[in-house]
Amino acid sequence: MVGMSVTALDRSVALPADVDQPAPRGGAVDLVEVGRAFSGTGGRRDVLRDLTVQIRAGEILAVVGPSGCGKSTLLRVIGGLDRPTAGAVTVAGQPVVDTDARTAIAFQEPRLLPWRTLAQNVELGLPQGTGRRAGRARVAELLELVGLTASADLNPRQVSGGMAQRASLARALARGPEVLLLDEPFGALDALTRLRMQDLLLQVHAVEPTTVVLVTHDVEEALFLADRVLLLRTLTPEDGSSSVARILTAPGERPRDRAEAAFADLRADLLTGLGVDTHHASPL
């Protein structure tokens, strides 16, 4: 079992002093001149074009950009759920050519099976061939990590949205992925639960330091959670395709103070890059 438990009210993101910080175990992700186009009745539409970025092993990279710019498509390409029409994607130096077991994804909706308990839903994420005893131990470990031990035998309809999302996160981690892909995982939650889930993600990453790629519409969330922030931009209004505009390094070490001047300055910089007045709220 892990040497810490997480409750919904825990606001700390630091490991206890007597627990060693684990080394990053995530895989580096390299995207080289990646493009993704779709064909339809209106002709060909490029969503991503000439996208080149290196995601470091064990880092949290947040992806922000205007609605419809291809953020979710980027996640699907990294995870092998969607094939690029140009370029190449590798995880830990090996090409991604199909649905890739080295990656796991969690969506905005928990997508839990309603007739199974939370523990049984988490169990579905275990790699094939996992022994019964090892599987039970891993599920118990993950439920403790996300603060759901006491709710393990409840069904999804019996728990809150935040608890269901924690179970979804645990299920994604059950595979032991080198890369964890998060597609606006907290977007449907209320403001307070969202803040708690942000802290929980940092706690989980401290214990299981896989590479994380997080898509979010919330600039403040991106800066609070990520090591770096990838800003996508639309290349041309005519075709709407997107590529990398900038990659920014988040200020200071985590946990970050949202009230610090450096945090506020970078938030304003990102919002300006997105074409948003800096006096507006951060969620886009």
Regions found by a protein language model. Name each.
Residues 133-151, 203:
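Conserved ABC ATPase "signature" region
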Residues 154-157, 175:
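Conserved signature/switch motifs of ABC ATPase nucleotide-binding domains
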Residues 79:
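Helix-to-loop junction immediately C-terminal to a conserved catalytic motif
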Residues 24-31, 37-50, 130:
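A short, flexible loop at the N-terminus of ABC-type nucleotide-binding domains that lies
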Residues 119-127, 136, 140, 249:
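Short helical segment in ABC ATPase nucleotide-binding domains corresponding to the A-loop/adjacent helical element
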Residues 64-66:
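The feature captures the beta-strand-to-loop junction immediately N-terminal to the Walker
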Residues 87-99, 135:
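Conserved ABC transporter NBD signature motif
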Residues 169:
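Hydrophobic anchor residue at the start of the ABC signature
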